[in-house]
């Protein structure tokens, strides 16, 4: 969109409003801000309308003599010209909280980060899911819970699966969400909640999981990584089979993010939480009794 606007839309808009490059200059940061904060579409129709609003505003200033030529538009000037931003950009959080993980999603208008939040309470082992999740995403959460119960019993830090209910919420509840690509993020959120170990809020992840613990490739990697970069994410965990998709990501973005590739949820646990499932197992506390692993 940036290239299309720079090379085609802006010159056309200037001509339509009787302006030229010596009359109006929209700097690169302002153009990126218009794209990110004032448009949300797969095409460029709304972007063209916003550029036209800027051109009309500049024309009025120049004709009235209240602005010199060229009239330079910066990102800081967009609020009085276009009003409040219409797209709220999520940014990486600064505080790590057990049970909270950053995922990556693809939408028809580009990628975005999403937060997966988990909490627990006394109960009977039930799993509650909220945030307008579709059937496929609910299945991913169920798989994640089964994997957590089967893999993390001896790492549970006193967590009682039988006597606890777990609630997973994905904010922006008014927006429907679906698809399998949040699998590893859902699992990591549950693992963080159960172990009490936090995940770096500057780390984001995407990938489908199976009941055997395999991590499968997902789509929309370019859009997801670009969204992560915009949000201030420093590390992205991806399925190994998506490694080739990095070729589609601009160099300036690819070199500023640390990529980690995984094949299994065991690797996700190690990379995201520092939990090694292959180390020597300690006895498992089960309801007030300590039972050696080999006797379970």
Outline where the language-model segments fall.
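Residue-level signal for threonine
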Residues: 27, 74, 250
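Conserved C-terminal "switch" segment of AAA+ ATPases
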Residues: 2-52, 57-71, 151-163, 196-202, ...
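Alpha-helix boundary/capping residues
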Residues: 8, 38-39, 85, 272-276
């Amino acid at each position: 969109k940036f290239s299309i606007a720079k090379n085609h839309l802006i010159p056309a808009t200037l001509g339509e409003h009787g302006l030229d490059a010596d009359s109006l200059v929209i700097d690169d940061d302002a153009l990126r801000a218009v794209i990110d904060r004032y448009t949300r579409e797969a095409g460029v129709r709304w972007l063209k309308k916003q550029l036209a609003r800027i051109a009309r505003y500049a024309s009025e200033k120049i004709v009235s003599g209240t602005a010199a030529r060229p009239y330079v538009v910066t990102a800081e000037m967009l609020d009085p010209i276009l009003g409040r931003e219409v797209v709220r950009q999520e940014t990486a959080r600064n505080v790590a909280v057990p049970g909270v993980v950053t995922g990556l999603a693809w939408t028809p208008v580009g990628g975005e980060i999403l937060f997966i939040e988990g909490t627990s309470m006394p109960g009977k082992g039930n799993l509650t899911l909220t945030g307008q999740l579709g059937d496929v995403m609910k299945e991913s959460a169920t798989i994640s819970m089964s994997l957590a119960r089967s893999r993390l019993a001896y790492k549970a830090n006193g967590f009682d699966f039988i006597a606890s209910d777990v609630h997973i919420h994905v904010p922006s509840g008014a927006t429907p969400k679906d698809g399998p690509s949040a699998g590893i993020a859902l699992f990591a959120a549950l693992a963080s909640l159960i172990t009490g170990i936090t995940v770096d809020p500057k780390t984001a992840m995407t990938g489908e999981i199976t009941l055997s613990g395999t991590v499968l490739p997902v789509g929309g990697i370019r859009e997801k990584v670009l969204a992560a970069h915009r949000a201030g994410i420093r590390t992205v965990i991806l399925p190994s089979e998506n490694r080739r998709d990095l070729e589609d990501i601009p160099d300036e973005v690819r070199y500023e993010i640390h990529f980690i590739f995984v094949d299994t949820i065991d690797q996700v646990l190690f990379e995201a939480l520092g939990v090694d499932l292959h180390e020597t197992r300690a006895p498992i506390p089960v309801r007030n009794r300590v039972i050696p692993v080999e006797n379970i």
